[in-house]
Amino acid sequence: YEKIGAEMVKEVAKKTDDVAGDGTTTATVLAQALVKEGLRNVAAGANPLGLKRGIEKAVEKVTETLLKSAKEVETKEQIAATAAISAGEQSIGDLIAEAMDKVGNEGVITVEES
């Protein structure tokens, strides 16, 4: 079961990165908690299929709530503010906003360590 759980957590992190580009740590912690509590409940006699259905319903509700509260990031200033929060530094947010302004929404920005 451990290998299956590790593979699932790895897949959660990959999908989160592919879809959102951020939040992999949060997704990994949540997935680990779900696996741990799920196994604990199954060991205590809970129906695994019932747990799965409950998790799926919870995912639907969380997704619905997140989509309702999501805000479009469109302007250069909004991009800079969002990137600064993610990077933890305003100057990096400004650089990312400038790069996005140059390449457009469909462009690719590659960041490398120097």
Curated annotation (Swiss-Prot):
GO BP terms, alphabetized: protein refolding
What the entry lists under Gene3D superfamilies is as follows: GroEL-like equatorial domain, TCP-1-like chaperonin intermediate domain
Which keywords does the record carry? Answer: ATP-binding, Chaperone, Cytoplasm, Isomerase, Nucleotide-binding, Stress response
Q: Name one GO cellular component term.
A: cytoplasm
- What's the catalysed reaction? ATP + H2O + a folded polypeptide = ADP + phosphate + an unfolded polypeptide
Enzyme class name: isomerase
Location within or outside the cell = Cytoplasm
Q: Where does ATP bind?
A: D22, G23, T24, T25, T26
A GO molecular function annotation here is: isomerase activity
Q: Which SUPFAM superfamilies match?
A: GroEL equatorial domain-like
Q: What is its EC number?
A: 5.6.1.7
Q: What does the sequence similarity comment in the record state about its family?
A: Belongs to the chaperonin (HSP60) family.
- Outline the subunit composition: Forms a cylinder of 14 subunits composed of two heptameric rings stacked back-to-back. Interacts with the co-chaperonin GroES.
Q: What does this protein do?
A: Together with its co-chaperonin GroES, plays an essential role in assisting protein folding. The GroEL-GroES system forms a nano-cage that allows encapsulation of the non-native substrate proteins and provides a physical environment optimized to promote and accelerate protein folding.
The identity of this protein, by name, is: Chaperonin GroEL
What organism does this protein naturally occur in?
Answer: Mycobacterium ulcerans
Name the encoding gene, please.
groEL
